[in-house]
Amino acid sequence: MTTTLRPTEPLQQPADGGRSRTYDICVNSRRVGSVRVATDPDFGAASGRIERLRVDEPDRGRGRGTVAALAAEEVLRGWGCSEVQISVPADAVPALGLARALGYTERSRNMLKELADGTPAPPSGIGVRSMTEEEYAAWETRARDSFARSWIDRGVPEEQARAKAAASHRDLLPEGLATPGTAIHVVVHDGRVVGHVWTGVRELEPGVSAGYVYDIEVAAEQRGRGYGRALMLLAERVTREAGETLLGLHVFAGNTPAIRLYESLGYRTTHVNSSKPLL
């Protein structure tokens, strides 16, 4: 039996230069599932994505998903992509195993927490306040560069990484500190800012919104003193005040201290994000 991809729509090419297309997964012309491939609007045309790969229940366990994934990679190669990205639900154990078998490496993960009523206040003796406009001007440049560097350190070409960082800040902070739904707070020690947390609200899926921690950092020499936990508790309080009951975040693979902190606060992994070079 032969497993192939059959287009279900014309190639989509929006004005931003991206591409996308949905395919049926077919075995001897019989439909057994579907998959969508696309270029990434933030990383640029050289980075592709495999999305919504699904094999119908009766045809699972027969290698259909493996062949479909490899065929989707070939489509992206034909579009000139040099890497492919995937995001797999954390509870989809077979799909995670398939990703590892096909050579994908975890790059980051998404985590989520259901917030209880009465979020505790930050520990006594730790001062937090809103970021000032003067602080924002210097912070924005540093934060954008740090975000890009995190991608570069995980194998993303510098041009793509900086494009991703610029697009994220442009889309999420169009009016800086005045951007609706945005809050950036700092933690202060002995009159000096030693950390920050940037929170907002985003749509996790159609009809489901949540608070979101876009960025959190504590100065290296001040880590291990409870400032990160204090900032995360502040993020919970800000999110509850905004009327949201969920708080999500994104954390890069290898950031073990941060992952342990989030897990200790009750966050669970919802998606594992992985990548693979297309040679």
Where are the regions a protein language model picked out?
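Conserved active-site alpha-helix within GNAT-family acetyltransferase domains
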Residues: 66, 90-108, 229, 253-271
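Conserved acetyl-CoA pyrophosphate-binding loop and the N-cap/start of the following alpha-helix
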Residues: 59, 63-71, 222, 226-234
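Conserved GNAT acetyl-CoA-binding A-motif
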Residues: 76-89, 240-250
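A short, internal acetyl-CoA/4′-phosphopantetheine-binding micro-motif in the GNAT/acyltransferase core
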Residues: 50-62, 88-90, 214-223
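A short beta-loop-alpha structural element at the N-terminal edge
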Residues: 5-15, 127-154
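C-terminal "cap" of GNAT-fold acetyltransferases
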Residues: 23, 28, 105, 109-135, ...
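Active-site rim helix/loop that mediates acceptor-substrate recognition in acyltransferases
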Residues: 2-28, 36, 159-188
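Conserved beta-strand in the GNAT
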Residues: 24, 30-39, 47-49, 54, ...
